[in-house]
Regions:
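Short, charged amphipathic alpha-helical surface segments
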Residues: 32-33
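Iron-sulfur cluster-binding cysteine motifs and their immediate structural context
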Residues: 1, 5-28, 39-55
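Iron-sulfur-associated redox domains of electron-transfer enzymes in respiratory
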Residues: 51-257
Length: 258
């Protein structure tokens, strides 16, 4: 899954991750450091399949502010929850795509940092030692919101090994994620074709103005070019961009997601 729950749990630093040919990282155990405690297997979410149940209630949510709604990839539910947590002195952990070549989870504690987490990121994020940070915040009584994929939420909960009243988790509907290496390869593909794009402007899902409604959601590969007065994004329909086409068709997901 790549949630790094095992790495965060190992007190002997016996686990490292190595990349396969597609850039997906898999755990490798250093047998000289390993003491066979079994903790890595215990916290692995693969060994704890979630209980399936039907929710008693289901809600459709959008933020009230149309300006805020337009800045979010979907309805802004995660943004609304994050605002509440930050307003009460809590912290939020979520995926940031500000550095598109290293999409990763970050911790924010101020409202002005919220834009770091907005937008859809169709790539596996690097969790690093996020779980350790979260446990530290929980132990001192901070309210924590963690937003991630179902695998990442599952990894966090098995890592913590107990429920916390001050932890809120929000996962999202996910059908799989490509690796960071594949995303970087696609950026390099455009550069080799002579497209001088602004990497910090790349988007996979955006909202465009519409004649029939306030906006419509479009999927594809959107970016700004490094040209004077380039304020209108160039776009490739998802079926014309190799990365987005492979993502939509599920052609290059991690083996555990097939």
């Amino acid at each position: 899954m790549g949630c790094l729950s095992c790495v965060n749990s190992c007190t002997h630093q016996a686990i490292e991750f190595e990349k396969d040919v597609c850039g997906f990282r898999y755990p490798i155990i250093d047998q000289e450091k390993c003491v066979d405690c079994g903790l890595c297997g215990f916290v692995c979410p693969v060994n704890h399949p979630p209980e399936k149940y039907f929710p008693k209630e289901c809600y459709a949510v959008t933020v009230k502010s149309e300006r805020e709604l337009f800045s979010c990839a979907s309805g802004g539910a995660a943004t609304a929850i994050a605002r509440h947590v930050l307003n009460t002195g809590g912290v939020v952990y979520g995926c940031s795509g500000m550095d598109i070549r290293h999409v990763r989870h970050v911790r924010i504690s101020r409202m002005e940092e919220l834009d770091l987490l907005k937008g859809s990121k169709y790539v596996q994020s690097d969790l690093g030692l996020t779980f350790k940070q979260i446990r530290g915040d929980l132990k001192v009584g901070k309210e924590v919101l963690f937003v991630g994929t179902p695998c990442q939420v599952g990894g966090l909960k098995t890592y913590l090994r107990k429920d916390y009243d001050n932890l809120i988790t929000a996962d999202l509907v996910c059908h799989g994620v490509p690796s960071q290496q594949l995303l970087n390869d696609n950026i390099d593909h455009y550069r080799k074709k002579g497209v001088d794009l602004q990497e910090d402007s790349i988007r996979f899902r955006t909202k465009m103005s519409s004649q029939t409604q306030s906006f419509k959601i479009e999927f594809g590969w959107f970016f700004l070019k490094n040209q004077p007065y380039s304020d209108s994004p160039s776009k490739k329909a998802y079926y014309r961009d190799p990365y987005m086409f492979g993502f939509i068709q599920g052609l290059f997901f991690r083996r555990s997601e097939e």
